[in-house]
Amino acid sequence: RAILRKPIDRIGYGGYLKLALQFPEFVDYVESVCNEFRQLYENIKGTTPYCVKRVAVLNCWGKMRAWGCHMVHHALYYKQNYSYAGVIEMLSGAPFEVKFISFEDIKNDPALLDELDVIINVGDADTAHTGGIWWEDADITSAIRRFVWNGGGFIGVGEPSGHPYQGHILQLASVLGVEEENGFTLNYDKYNWEEHPDHFILQDADQPMDFGEGKKNIYALEGTEILVQRNKEVQMAAHDFGKGRAVYISGVPYSFANSRTLYRAILWSAH
């Protein structure tokens, strides 16, 4: 689906070209694949595919690592990574206009958020994937909060906005409606554990959500709708923030079912 939405014009070949001469069937196959790509180009004629919403993946690299921000060594499986890489895989073939923006982009031009419907922040806390120390910048946090409060959507996967600062682990805890327990709030009463399996995001799910490695010690704040919790650890939640909406998901390995759920999460958050 990704190739149909935006045809590629390069096929990577690793190895010595002279070795390919020893395998004429391989050369013939490459020729046939090239012809398939040419046919796609001819049929699509450079048109822009239909896009339901405008989505931006927010990390420290922005456009510099577009589509490759969770890919390690030819996208090989890694236990620490696959629960996040699925988000990028899903976006590549989904009917969205996808951009990759950095925190520096927002710092330099907060108005760029006005051109978006949903922001996605994916990864572990204090990494370039989620932002780390950038979350101490009040200009950036206020711009993102304002974006959601005025009607934008925010999808957080893993430990979004994760950076210990001013008494919070998740700097957008009030937006996401969830926080991570690290021992500092053990004595806080936590009453919100009721699940809402009939929520719009899960309405057509025909199997339980696969969160991959998931996350431990995530709890919901008051007013948050928990979609899935396991052993009193929130795996998926939805939260209204002003006119906007936010969704928290602990992990999204790639699968058809997970893609559908993330698709519905984006639509719900953008409403």
Where do the language-model regions lie?
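A glycine-rich, often tryptophan-bearing local segment used as a flexible ligand/cofactor-contacting loop or short
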Residues: 130-207
